[in-house]
């Protein structure tokens, strides 16, 4: 008997050849093929949970990496802001760019204390800012701060108000290599009082510089008085200003 061909095997399966119990007769080759397919399907199904688990782990790792990158970026921006503020403080206090943070913050605390003390000392004299009827000069040695290399002076000038008074004051301070830290000016009824807090380099100035500043301000007042008298002596009448005042030279050291 010749072996069945594949067409005959398929026909036998479809025709349903009966076997003693009325079942179907299926060839061994066909059953082997079906079992192979079933086995492959089972293997594929068992693979899917592992693949899904791997995807979940990958997503968790991606989220962790994204959170880490965000944290690093936030930390970088925070450090940039801190360094920017520190550089501004270095510029305000005239510190070297290499000054470390601890030294810089110590200088800031010291400067704040100095300003607080100056505020307390000057608050008592606020009522005396109003200009008087007498020309006055007052020059004080206001403080000695060796840490930042500057010596502080306080100068007060009361005289007739004129448009070029402030430029003349600035020119005097510039000629003496002094820098203005604070300035207050009050003008009432043609009279003005200027109170200046100035700083000078300790390598160029000492306590004796009080006299240099005082003499420069005295010269300024004398020029101002002379100019005022010349302007008030208009025409041929020679009438002098009724507001002419003598110079009371007050020096406090």
From Swiss-Prot:
Domain bHLH: 66-115
One annotated GO biological process: hyperosmotic salinity response
UniProt key word Nucleus: yes
Keywords from the UniProt entry: DNA-binding, Nucleus, Transcription, Transcription regulation
InterPro entries: AIG1-like, bHLH_dom, HLH_DNA-bd_sf
Subcellular location, record wording: Nucleus
Pfam family, one: HLH
The keyword Transcription regulation belongs to this UniProt entry's keyword annotation: yes
Location, primary (coarse class): nucleus
Gene3D superfamilies recorded: Helix-loop-helix DNA-binding domain
Signal sequence extent: none
GO molecular function: DNA binding; DNA-binding transcription factor activity; protein dimerization activity
Cross-referenced PROSITE patterns: BHLH
GO cellular component term of the entry, any: nucleus
Subunit and partners: Homodimer.
Name this polypeptide is given: Transcription factor bHLH106
């Amino acid at each position: 008997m010749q072996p069945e061909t594949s067409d005959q095997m398929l026909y036998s399966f479809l025709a349903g050849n009966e076997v003693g119990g009325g079942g179907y007769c299926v060839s061994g080759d066909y059953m082997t093929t079906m079992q192979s397919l079933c086995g492959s399907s089972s293997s594929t199904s068992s693979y899917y949970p592992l693949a899904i688990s791997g995807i979940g782990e990958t997503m968790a790792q991606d989220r962790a990496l994204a959170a880490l990158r965000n944290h690093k970026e936030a930390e970088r921006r925070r450090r940039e802001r801190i360094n920017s503020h520190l550089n501004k403080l270095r510029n305000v206090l005239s510190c070297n760019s290499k000054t470390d943070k601890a030294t810089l913050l110590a200088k800031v605390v010291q400067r704040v204390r100095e300003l607080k003390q100056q505020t307390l000392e000057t608050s008592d004299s606020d009522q005396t800012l109003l200009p008087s009827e007498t020309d006055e000069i007052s020059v004080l040695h206001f403080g000695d701060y060796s840490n930042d290399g500057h010596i502080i002076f306080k100068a007060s000038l009361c005289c007739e108000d004129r448009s070029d008074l402030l430029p003349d004051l600035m020119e005097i301070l510039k000629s003496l290599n002094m820098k203005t830290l604070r300035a207050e000016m009050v003008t009432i009824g043609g009279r003005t009082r200027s109170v200046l807090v100035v700083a000078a380099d300790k390598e160029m100035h000492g306590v004796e510089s009080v006299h240099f500043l005082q003499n420069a301000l005295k010269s300024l007042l004398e020029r101002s008085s002379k100019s005022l008298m010349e302007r008030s002596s208009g025409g041929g009448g020679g009438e002098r200003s009724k507001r002419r005042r003598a110079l009371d030279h007050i020096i406090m050291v």
